[in-house]
Amino acid sequence: MAAKKNSKSQPATGDNRQKALDAALAMIEKDFGKGAVMRLGDDNRPPISAISSGNTAIDVALGIGGFPKGRIVEVYGPESSGKTTVALHAIAQAQRAGGIAAFIDAEHALDPDYARKLGVDTDALLVSQPDTGEQALEIADMLVRSGAIDIIVIDSVAALTPKAEIEGEMGDSHVGLQARLMSQALRKMTGALYNSGTTAIFINQLREKIGVMFGSPETTTGGKALKFYASVRCDVRRIQTLKDGQDAIGNRTRLKVVKNKVSPPFKIAEFDIMYGEGISRESSIIDLGVDNGIIKKSGSWFTYDGDQLGQGKEKVRLYLKQTPELADEIEEKIFRALQIGKYANQNDALTDDPVDMVPNIDFDDEDNG
């Protein structure tokens, strides 16, 4: 009987290894196109670019000056914590830079008047109010694959109701439907987002797990897929009510970057959300300017470059709002001092110890997976 042919590949040796690799690469390039496989050192792509959040503190916490382009971002937190406000500010910044934005309003709760106050060009904003979760994610996928969208916001994951649940009876069990829907959609969208350079912001809600004895009982809706596919996850919480006398005028809000694949994680940003006005960029510029020695504070007086800005933080905030050129100048100095965005040193960023850079870390809140 003839010997059975051995179908196992034999390891190449010596010069044959390079020849075998070159032949395989040539075949892959022929079948799948140029660039299907490349050496990492030959990749001449620029550093990850970002869409500004519109707030200096958030841009600093994200590490690259904003939300990364071509990636998935999850913004979650309790009700009325400022999640949609953060996303709308990012849309406004993308539009100011000449980009096109889309908003998938699964909650059917978008307020156009409030969006306009935050700087969103509502006439140019693409809005969809889908009937089902499948329809919402299919529309989002088609917009991303067009290659024309710079940022797309899905508000919210919890409202992406599967078609079977909508058509079913009240009380019917639909275990895992939404999780499977999200998992399939994210598998499809991830590559398209990277190729088109579109930033996708998924707004999510919190739920509580029953029977948890240790650790946080809080979890997000939609299964685990979004946790894995997201390059950045932001936990947004309201920590204080801002008052003018007895009247509430806004909220002090904390954003914690609990996962970050493009910069060291666990950084925290605190900022003010003023009612009817949105996130106060000027307030964050004052806070970071003082922290980094760019703005000098003596008692209640604030001084910049030898000139007095005013007495009291609120007066200085209003002054910076009336002089945006000065606010831009101070913000640029903050980014330069902290090496954020275009001022980042890419080589140093890979060797920095994130624990040394971020005070008061609570590793029990979230993992970085």
UniProtKB/Swiss-Prot annotation:
Cystine connections: none
Residues that hold ATP according to the record: 77-84
Annotated NCBIfam families: tigrfam_recA
A cellular-component GO term for this protein: cytosol
InterPro entries: AAA+_ATPase, DNA_recomb/repair_RecA, DNA_recomb/repair_RecA_CS, P-loop_NTPase, RecA-like_C, RecA-like_N, RecA_ATP-bd, RecA_C_sf
Taxonomic classification: Bacteria, Bacillati, Actinomycetota, Actinomycetes, Mycobacteriales
Main location: cytoplasm
GO-annotated biological processes: DNA recombination; DNA repair; SOS response
Localization of this protein: Cytoplasm
Protein name, entry field: Protein RecA
Molecular function terms, GO-annotated: ATP binding; ATP hydrolysis activity; ATP-dependent DNA damage sensor activity; damaged DNA binding; single-stranded DNA binding
PROSITE patterns linked: RECA_1, RECA_2, RECA_3
Function: Can catalyze the hydrolysis of ATP in the presence of single-stranded DNA, the ATP-dependent uptake of single-stranded DNA by duplex DNA, and the ATP-dependent hybridization of homologous single-stranded DNAs. It interacts with LexA causing its activation and leading to its autocatalytic cleavage.
Entry keyword DNA repair: yes
PANTHER family named in the record: MITOCHONDRIAL DNA REPAIR PROTEIN RECA HOMOLOG-RELATED, RECA
Pfam families: RecA, RecA_C
